[in-house]
Amino acid sequence: MKVIHTIKDLQAELTVLRAQGKKVGLVPTMGALHVGHASLVKRSVSENGVTVVSVFVNPTQFNDKNDLAKYPRTLDADCRLLEDCGAAFAFAPSVEEMYPQPDTREFSYAPLDTVMEGAFRPGHFNGVCQIVSKLFDAIQPDRAYFGEKDFQQLAIIREMVRQMNYKLEIVGCPIVREEDGLALSSRNKRLSAQERENALNISRTLFKSRTFATSHTVSETQKMVEEAIEAAPGLRLEYFEIVDGNTLQKVNSCLLYTSPSPRDA
């Protein structure tokens, strides 16, 4: 596996490989990779001749400068994992490489980006679309892989691809969880043992809600989840919504929308 730091060098490598008829898969990440990321990379490797994994902590999607500063950066360990997964390239550019000038583009995909996470983190999804569009333009992948854990982000990226006429396939990949049910996340490294235990109440409540929803109304299910999270130690609920998986708009009945894998962070 090669570690590449500039768009020019990566494009030169990909030009040669495309001339050989190879398809290119892209897995965009911010590093601090774990088994969940590995599942995306392995899927890309199985479906494409070449897999590029970007490792870039994108500053434009952070609302909190402290969160940006504290985000784990583990490039050496990330590269070892990527090599084990069979990736061809780790693309690890600098901020200056990706943003030689400030990106003033405004992406608006309302109502997809104005509800839930969009309401609590204004500007976040605009930053996500900025960097993802830059990666698509630079790499021109045939397929790009995103985890369903960030389900709202996945829906927004699908809409961006549709509106901007990108000629690629967006592949959503299932959530990967610890044995006890906690969804894998790079930020889990920042949790204390007690905070991690508290976080388990999120996935436990969501799995309970899946069964609960089969015999209760949307409002009853909403109330059950809200009360369970508020009663759990160390947790404060920001939002819980039951929505259509494509439009992210609230639904009147959850019977058609119950899923074997509740989406949570």
Residues covered by each model-derived region:
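Nucleotidyltransferase catalytic core that binds NTPs
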Residues: 2-235, 242-247
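Single conserved hydrophobic/aromatic residue that forms the stacking wall/gate
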Residues: 257-265
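A structural signal for short secondary-structure junctions
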Residues: 233-234, 254-256
